[in-house]
Design a protein with these regions (language model features):
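Conserved catalytic scaffold of divalent metal-dependent phosphoesterases
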Residues: 5, 9-14, 59-60, 66-156, ...
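A short, gly/pro- and small-residue-rich
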Residues: 47-56, 158-161
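Binuclear metal-dependent phosphoesterase catalytic core
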Residues: 6, 83-88, 164-168, 181-236
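Basic, amphipathic N-terminal segments that precede the first structured/catalytic domain
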Residues: 19, 42, 50, 55, ...
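Short, conserved loop/helix-junction motifs that constitute active-site signature segments
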Residues: 23-24, 44-48, 71-73, 131, ...
Length: 236
């Protein structure tokens, strides 16, 4: 599966009538925050692929557009506080915003992030029972603690994200928030089984979507065999 990840800055070659020529082969778009709704809506309309997003700390509560005011991008799926399965079987979860540094919106304390991370656990456990794994793609705006983050308070990483990576081992953790102005800034780090990637601007990524392991089908197979035997014996 091919993913187009975008974050933080609008790019002319994406907000362009020719975007489908360059990115028409992607299967999914992931937006990691601080992008206007009209930008995400344009990508959806041009590529005709599902877009999943979280909000960044600079997101507007209400955005005016040609179709009138709206509180979310039309046609996109907000991942904040959710653990979901895509129609292709990709398991996604997300948390918005960044560490609180003033009274602005979409900012949370480290303690609040811990609470939100723990709230994802039931959904991730359900994923494990149904799909044989917890999570494929973790989507956040802020970065994990001491991974791609900075020392100033607005750009400090989130400690709870490190825990989510360690325990649930997603294949990808996509984030934004950290602007990349120099070539020597690290934007990709391997943490165990997880590739942590700063999607500032855009990134094209590939994800291998695992199939369900056979043992998850075994209870259904046993039940089906039992029903077939009962039918043969005319007991049902």
């Amino acid at each position: 599966m091919k993913i187009l990840a975008v974050s933080d800055v609008e790019l002319g070659f994406i907000y362009s009538p020719t975007v489908a020529q360059r990115f028409g082969d992607v299967d999914m778009i992931v937006a990691c925050g601080d992008l206007p709704y009209y930008y995400m809506e344009f990508i959806i309309s041009m590529l005709d692929k599902p877009l999943y997003y979280v909000r960044g700390n600079h997101a507007s509560k209400l955005e005016e557009g040609s179709g009138g005011p709206r509180r979310a991008p039309w046609g996109a799926v907000d991942l904040h506080h959710k653990a979901i399965a895509d129609e292709r079987g990709v398991l996604l979860a997300g948390l918005e915003g960044c560490v609180r540094y003033n009274q602005g919106g979409y900012q949370y304390t480290q303690a609040q992030y811990w609470s939100m991370a723990f709230s994802l656990v039931p959904g991730l456990m359900a994923n494990r029972a149904i799909h044989g794994r917890y999570l494929d793609v973790l989507v956040t705006h802020a970065s994990p603690w001491k991974i791609h983050d900075m020392d100033d308070r607005p750009h400090q990483g989130v400690k709870a994200f490190n825990w989510l990576i360690k325990v649930f081992q997603p294949a990808l953790h996509l984030h934004g928030h950290i602007h990349v102005y120099r070539n020597n800034i690290e934007t990709e780090t391997q943490v165990g089984k997880t590739r942590v990637i700063n999607a500032y601007g855009y990134r094209e990524l590939y994800l291998d979507v695992p199939t369900r392991p056979d043992y998850l089908y075994e209870p259904k197979r046993k039940a089906r065999r039992y029903i077939d035997e009962m039918k043969r014996e005319k007991k049902i």
